[in-house]
């Protein structure tokens, strides 16, 4: 697909409907449980009054008033759940309407003018059917008018939403969330922003994540686990073990060894029994069992370490050997921040699985797709291409050609998007080479954009490619010089002015 189409945008924005849908399902189940609980309670209260006709009237009135008060509380909870359901449905409607706007920015494209006629070849019936189905899909698709100013505004809104999504999720401050501040600011001029992003859920997600990573507090993640316990149990989640593991190590850090041992026997020991796992959850059993084995060694480490600090005289020879062993010091890692990283990763994995969304930020996904379509092997720096060296004539037989400016090419302190363009007195505007996007783009694949625009292209040893006719037929300015070189079996690079033997040139066949 070379042009943005309507179907592409519908497919790429389908994930924004998952969270409201899951929240509606969850809220509906909450309403069901609320109604069933209230129904049972009212039935029991009425039956209790009927079974005891001799109860004094005053007591009966008190029981009725209590039931009425309970029912009023039920009504308030029910109204709040209904309002929440209406809010979630309004978000779905707003997103459908917002996505439907791009259907007004489409153009009718005559594909028959752009398609190249293919020679008729015998095809099987299956191939013919597949081609017709693919052709039908393409014919039903619509392409967007990129010159439409309303479409540009629509894209700008989408970009703002992606930025808000990233800022809300990646916030590390506890006093305020900069993503929410930006959302409120933009909503003053465009109120629909509040309906197009699930800011409240992402804020809750960020609070739990920050409480784990920054505050090392388990209160919020425990509450989230209890709220979604049924789903996590069905999904074979290991979050409960990670929480209990962190609680155990926190008790060890505080010095409550006896309390930690008691907590471990109740909350961690069952994870060592394979019968407590499902058949599809063997991987978690092996992982948890290995970590449980380390707990015993950690207690020994804490005991010997405490003995070493409290006693002034020499400790036992065996204990001294144990302290100096490499394995002994590995237990120090158990009390590092790695456990909080593991817990946060487990929480993120379960959160994204619950709502069917990606672990990566949506803005990174779009940026990666765009950068992958632009990335070439010339991005950052290319040690083979001598265009990045000083523009001077060097004989190819001189070995210094490959050593000159080697420090600039290999030293990390010279890495940067503009280092080599400074050598050329040019400005590098490539987004792939920009310092802001370097880390995101460095692991992306190269774009398959290499096409031959030359007739009979040849690659020189320095990496530059030219049509062979241009190398053999120089301009009038360098005619005499080139003729002299050709008689010697050599050619000159028109750009870098380097001289090479013709035999060292290679015929290339770009895709």
Curated annotation (Swiss-Prot):
Stored Pfam families: CTLH
Keywords: Cytoplasm, Metal-binding, Nucleus, Zinc, Zinc-finger
Record-linked InterPro entries: CRA_dom (IPR013144), CTLH/CRA (IPR024964), CTLH_C (IPR006595), Fyv10_fam (IPR045098), ZF_RING_GID (IPR044063)
Comp. bias intervals (Polar residues): 117-126
Localization annotation: Cytoplasm; Nucleus
Cysteine pairings via disulfide bonds: none
Start and end residues of each CTLH domain: 201-259
GO BP annotations listed: negative regulation of gluconeogenesis; proteasome-mediated ubiquitin-dependent protein catabolic process
Biased composition (Basic and acidic residues): 131-142
Protein name: Protein FYV10
Record gene name: FYV10
């Amino acid at each position: 697909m070379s042009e943005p189409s309507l179907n592409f945008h519908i497919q790429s924005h389908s994930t924004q409907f998952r969270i409201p849908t899951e929240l509606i399902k969850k809220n509906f189940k909450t309403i069901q449980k609320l109604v069933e609980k209230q129904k049972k309670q009212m039935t029991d209260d009425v039956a209790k009054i009927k079974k005891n006709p001799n109860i004094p009237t005053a007591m009966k009135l008190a029981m009725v008033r209590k039931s009425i008060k309970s029912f009023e509380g039920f009504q308030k909870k029910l109204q709040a759940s209904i309002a929440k359901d209406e809010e979630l449905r309004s978000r779905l409607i707003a997103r459908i309407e917002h996505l439907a706007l791009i259907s007004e920015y489409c153009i009718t494209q005559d594909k028959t003018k752009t398609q190249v006629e293919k020679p008729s070849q015998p095809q099987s019936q299956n191939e013919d059917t597949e081609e017709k189905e693919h052709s039908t899909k393409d014919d039903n698709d619509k392409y967007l008018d990129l010159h439409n100013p309303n479409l540009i505004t629509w894209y700008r809104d989408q970009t703002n939403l992606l930025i808000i999504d990233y800022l809300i999720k990646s916030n590390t401050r506890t006093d305020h969330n900069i993503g929410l501040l930006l959302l409120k600011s933009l909503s003053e001029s465009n109120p629909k922003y509040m309906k197009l992003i699930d800011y409240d859920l992402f804020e809750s997600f960020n609070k739990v994540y920050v409480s784990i990573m920054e505050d090392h507090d388990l209160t919020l993640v425990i509450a989230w686990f209890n709220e979604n316990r049924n789903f996590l149990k069905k999904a074979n989640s290991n979050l409960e073990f990670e929480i209990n593991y962190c609680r155990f190590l926190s008790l060890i850090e505080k010095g409550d060894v006896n309390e930690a041992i008691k907590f471990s026997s109740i909350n961690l020991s069952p994870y060592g029994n394979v019968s407590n796992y499902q058949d599809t959850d063997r991987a978690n059993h092996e992982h948890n069992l290995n970590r449980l084995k380390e707990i015993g060694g950690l207690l020994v480490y804490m005991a010997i370490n405490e003995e070493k600090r409290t006693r002034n005289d020499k400790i036992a020879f065996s204990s001294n050997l144990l302290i100096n062993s490499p394995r002994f010091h590995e237990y120090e890692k158990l009390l590092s921040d790695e456990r909080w990283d593991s817990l946060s990763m487990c929480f993120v994995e379960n959160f994204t699985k619950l709502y069917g969304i990606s672990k990566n930020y949506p803005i990174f996904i779009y940026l990666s797709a765009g950068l992958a379509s632009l990335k070439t092997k010339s991005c950052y720096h290319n040690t083979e291409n001598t265009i990045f060296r000083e523009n001077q004539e060097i004989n190819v037989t001189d070995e210094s050609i490959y050593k000159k400016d080697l420090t600039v090419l290999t030293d990390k302190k010279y890495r940067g998007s503009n280092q080599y363009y400074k050598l050329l007195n040019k400005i590098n505007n490539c987004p792939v080479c920009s310092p802001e996007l370097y880390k995101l783009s460095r692991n992306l694949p190269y774009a398959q954009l290499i096409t031959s625009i030359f007739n009979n292209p040849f690659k020189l040893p320095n990496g530059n490619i030219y049509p062979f006719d241009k190398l053999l037929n120089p301009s009038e300015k360098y005619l005499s010089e080139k003729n002299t070189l050709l008689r010697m079996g050599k050619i000159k690079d028109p750009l870098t002015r380097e001289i090479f033997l013709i035999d060292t040139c290679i015929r290339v066949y770009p895709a």
